[in-house]
C-alpha cells in the first residue's frame, strides 16, 4: 500500500503560485516513481487577501496540525503595508505551530553559479540552522517622545534556555548525520545575553563526542563564509543573524533563486518554501525560476521520510544545470514550466543521484 501525506498548499502572491505549481509538477513525478501520494488542500492566504481585510487567526492555524506539511510560495504585495502580511502569515505559522527550526541548505548546484573564483560544488555544501521563534522578531516596540530630539524606540531581544537547547541540539543531531562539524555563530562579545548559546553549546557538546564544534562571532563568520566556505558544515545561529547570513550564503551559491528553506518542528507539520520574494513584476509571465520551489519540495520530502525521492530531486536539479536544461536562476533564464517538466522527467525516469546527499 502506498503512503499518503496531507499537504496544505499556499501559493501566495506574485510569482508564488506559478513556482509552487512548478514544484507540484516535480512532486507528482516523485509520487509516480517512489510509490507514495499526496492529498493536497489549497489555501488562499496571501498579502492580496490581507489588503482586502483577511487575517490569519489562531483558529485558522490550529487545523493545520492535522497536515503532514505545508508548501508555501511567496508572500508580499506592493500595495500592502510593509511587513504586515508577512508577519500575519509567516510569523503566524512559525509561532502558531512552534516551528523553531529554520533550515537553510547552502548548496552549489553548478560551479558556474558561484561568484567565488576557483570554488566548485565540492567546496560549498553547508546548512544554516536558524532559531526561528525567539530573538527580536515579533516583539513589541515602544516609542516615546515621538517627533522630538528625545525620541526613543525600544524593543527586546529574548533567548530562553529551552529555545537555545533545542536549536543547538537539532544542530548537533544534523551534524552527526552529515560531516560531523558544527559552528555556532553569535555576537556574545557585544550582546552579552547571547552567552547562553555558548553555555549550552559547551554542555551539549559533551553528549556528541563524535561532532567537532566551535563558535565564531557573526562578523568573522560572514568573512569566512565568503573566503573559506569549505570550513562550514552545520552552522547554528540566532534568529536575527540567521536571517542575514543565510542570504549571504545564498549569494555565494548563485542568489536567492537557488534557495529553499524549511520552517520545521521535528516530527510535526512544518512549512517549506523558496527563499525568494513574490517578485510581482514577473507575475503571470511564466519566466520565474522554479529552482527554489523545487528545492523546497525536496526538503519537504526529506522531512516526511521520503529521502530517496528527495535525493532524486536534488540529483535532477544538478543534472539540469550540468546539461543546460536549467540555464540559470534569474527571471527570464527559462520558462517556469519548461524547467519544471525537465526536472520532473529526470526524477521520473533517471537513476537516483549517487553523488548527491540529502538536502539537509
Model-derived features: where do they sit?
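Buried hydrophobic positions in well-ordered alpha/beta secondary-structure cores of metabolic enzymes
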Residues: 13-16, 68, 129, 171, ...
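Internal helix-turn-beta structural module
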Residues: 283, 303-360
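Short acidic loop-to-helix transition motifs that present clustered carboxylates
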Residues: 46, 111, 216-223
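Buried hydrophobic packing segments
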Residues: 23, 27, 201, 293-301, ...
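N-terminal glycine-rich phosphate/adenylate-binding segment common to multiple enzyme folds
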Residues: 50-154, 240
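Glycine-rich phosphate/diphosphate-binding loop of Rossmann-like nucleotide-binding domains
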Residues: 8-25, 29-31, 148-219
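N-terminal beta-loop-helix "entrance" segment that forms/cooperates
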Residues: 35-58, 223-225
